[in-house]
């Protein structure tokens, strides 16, 4: 009598990420740098790299001035990230140059939650976010602590791409009255339900009132501005 060989037991997610260098018999020999990123995937669809200490034991020098470029280049082409929907990269000195590489990725097409807080994007980086087709699905956008001023804020407010955003956090930037007024007058951010502009030098009562009474932001339920 022929006996069917027992089927191979499928591995769970935790077993996969701890499966040596082959990661679930996929035959992929990840570099230590790639392994650190792979192990930063949470719940299969969330990439969470909250600081550069993730890479301390990999041999990759996160203090290198080119670290943001190297990280962006790897993420943009790293096949396991094709199912990622939430992208969280904070405290990694991510700048506009790195962001240009990231938004050209053919892999990261499903991002709907984007957190790039505590980096070095500046106005140029904000403009790249605003113009990137990669982010058309984003509903939650966190760009706190990035040195973004009125020009970058205007780019976000007039973006033809970020029309699905319902939650926007710009905490501790340099939005100012000018940037706040741009958001208040935004047609493209009309779906906002939550807006945090704390620590943004929004001083004038005119700007604050414009946000509170904006005929554009009719869905807004939570506004924090100080």
What annotation goes with each model-predicted range?
Residues 33-44, 73-82, 101-109, 128-136, ...:
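Leucine-rich repeat
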Residues 189-226:
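Leucine-rich solenoid repeat scaffolds
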Residues 2, 82, 221-223:
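Alpha-helical solenoid scaffolds in eukaryotic macromolecular assemblies
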Residues 6-113, 117-120:
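LRR N-terminal entry segment and analogous cap-like coil->beta motifs
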Residues 117-118, 124-170, 179:
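Eukaryotic tandem repeat interaction scaffolds
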Residues 54-56, 61-73, 93-100, 120-127, ...:
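Short, solvent-exposed loop/turn at the beta-strand->alpha-helix junction
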Residues 47-49, 87-89, 114-116, 138-143, ...:
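Conserved hydrophobic beta-strand positions in leucine-rich repeat
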Residues 171-193:
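Short, positively charged, low-complexity/disordered linker segments
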């Amino acid at each position: 009598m022929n006996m069917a060989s027992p089927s191979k037991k499928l591995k769970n997610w935790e077993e996969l990420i701890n499966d040596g260098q082959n990661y679930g018999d996929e035959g992929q020999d990840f570099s230590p740098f790639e392994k650190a990123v792979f192990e930063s995937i949470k719940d299969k669809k969330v990439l969470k790299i909250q600081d550069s200490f993730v890479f301390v034991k990999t041999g990759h020098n996160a203090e290198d001035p080119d670290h943001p470029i190297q990280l962006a280049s790897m993420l943009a082409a790293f096949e396991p990230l094709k199912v990622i929907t939430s992208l969280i990269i904070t405290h990694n000195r991510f700048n506009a140059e790195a962001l240009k590489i990231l938004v050209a990725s053919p892999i990261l097409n499903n991002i709907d939650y984007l957190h790039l807080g505590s980096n070095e994007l500046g106005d140029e980086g904000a403009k790249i976010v605003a113009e990137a087709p990669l982010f058309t699905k984003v509903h939650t956008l966190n760009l706190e602590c990035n040195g973004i001023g009125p020009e970058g804020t205007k780019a976000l407010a007039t973006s033809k791409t970020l029309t699905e955003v319902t939650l926007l956090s710009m905490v501790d930037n340099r939005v100012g009255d000018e940037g706040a007024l741009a958001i208040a007058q935004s047609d493209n951010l009309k779906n906002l339900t939550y807006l945090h502009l704390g620590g943004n030098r929004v001083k004038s009562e005119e700007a604050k009132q414009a946000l509170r009474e904006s005929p554009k932001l009719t869905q807004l339920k939570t506004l924090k501005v100080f």
